[in-house]
């Protein structure tokens, strides 16, 4: 927001004609005369739509601060579009000015607001002293930071049902200690490039696309496969939980009041479009799910109702300098699972189940999560026994944050975070209790009492964004490099088995083995190149392939192969049937997709 503050002897105005965006006004507001006034010429800007409440707070703060110095009898809010070339929507601008008028009035000031969207003739007499003409740029960030400082959260460790002061807690887990330090502002900074950025390129998963916006990636066949497998995995998880899959638009109209308020609550920077409509690219699937649920007739018998959408993509307009690798992007893939619950008991029961699901993803993905359990003080006081039961379920110490009051749409949430090589959290799964959106989006159900009620909503992402899952897996390999060979879980490895031929006359047999292994839904390829066996083995190792074996005369004759098992570093003699059984046992219950590349390495494109 841009403002120009004029301390004036008087301001007179007369309304002349409407513009297309003029607000409706009474005749009494078509003219005005104010003596001894601080006139605040205002232009609400496009960026202000991200957090209009923060803009109002800081505008009011600046006006009060200036008026304390000049001691004007009246405050006049005067909309003046000429202060900026990047204006907000008229709807947002009017609401900001109305809210500012109300807030200044609540402070005991004599405040008037000049009509928005009208051509006006005006006359003003500036007093001419050093403080009589001031220009300011109003943003929301300073006020948000100040608010946090005024009312800090309380932090402790929850270990089962025991609350332990952080200063008294003996950390046996350095990953939890790093998470605590980061959350309290004493941990690793966000400077430095994490190892996964190099690895995502080396392993031909993905890379930056210079012809696009920053934070938008291009995905190569191997990376696309890993993303798709993770998406399949989450789909299976949530459908088992009773979710109904949906698909909704990626664009939403910020002139829709419910969407505008929810977007402001979310607090992330958003992609906006410069069109006739005030459109925003979604930052999550919430809007779509809520609008789907606002239309049908729902009764208590239908609840809990669960909707799932994989957003390809969601968008957040992160600062250019903050965008890094797979961890922080402007376009990303987010599994969004929403549950609509009839009452708090049902909500807590579903929250517990979804916490179990998030814990299971850590096991299935072989990612170690550290956990932050967050709640408002009111929620904690009312539900502390239930929170302790969740602590026991988790089975290890977690960081507990108690907020003095609710600042967002949620009253309680649990966040799971992997820790990267540099000691910084990668936020992954989450479950959140939303106590606002049911009413805001007019989602109702008919209760057993015959009355309409608003449901409580659970937001859950069982893995977090797909990109951050891959980020976590790659960072884990860097952390454990001194302990074991880096690799992805077998079911996520783009190539699970590589067959290496000794010579040209072994290719037919290698192809027979390929056909047999491939028929069992195992991703297998053949290194048929005219290279030494040693070089082929080294190349397979750089691709982190879980199982490698060589086909020569002896193997062809005996049917027994010396298989290099990457996970253990051992060479194990086994038949093809034994190899197939081991892999199928290891990947049981996990999704499968076929090899995303030509089976013969000699025909492949190198994407890096």
UniProtKB/Swiss-Prot annotation:
A single Gene Ontology molecular function, please? ATP binding
A single Gene Ontology CC annotation of this entry is: cytoplasm
Function in brief:
Catalyzes the attachment of threonine to tRNA(Thr) in a two-step reaction: L-threonine is first activated by ATP to form Thr-AMP and then transferred to the acceptor end of tRNA(Thr). Also edits incorrectly charged L-seryl-tRNA(Thr).
Required cofactor(s): Zn(2+)
Q: What is the source species?
A: Methanobrevibacter smithii (strain ATCC 35061 / DSM 861 / OCM 144 / PS)
Query: What GO biological process term is on the record, naming one?
Result: threonyl-tRNA aminoacylation
User: Which keywords has UniProt assigned to this entry?
Assistant: Aminoacyl-tRNA synthetase, ATP-binding, Cytoplasm, Ligase, Metal-binding, Nucleotide-binding, Protein biosynthesis, RNA-binding, tRNA-binding, Zinc
Q: What is its main location?
A: cytoplasm
The family database entries (PANTHER family) matched by this protein are listed as: THREONINE--TRNA LIGASE, CHLOROPLASTIC_MITOCHONDRIAL 2 (PTHR11451:SF44), THREONINE-TRNA LIGASE (PTHR11451)
Q: Which family, according to UniProt? A: Belongs to the class-II aminoacyl-tRNA synthetase family.
The record's HAMAP family line, in alphabetical order, gives: Thr_tRNA_synth
Disulfide bonds, paired cysteine numbers: none
- Quick one: which gene encodes this? thrS
- Region annotation (Editing domain) ranges: 1-144
Please report the name of this protein according to its UniProt entry: Threonine--tRNA ligase
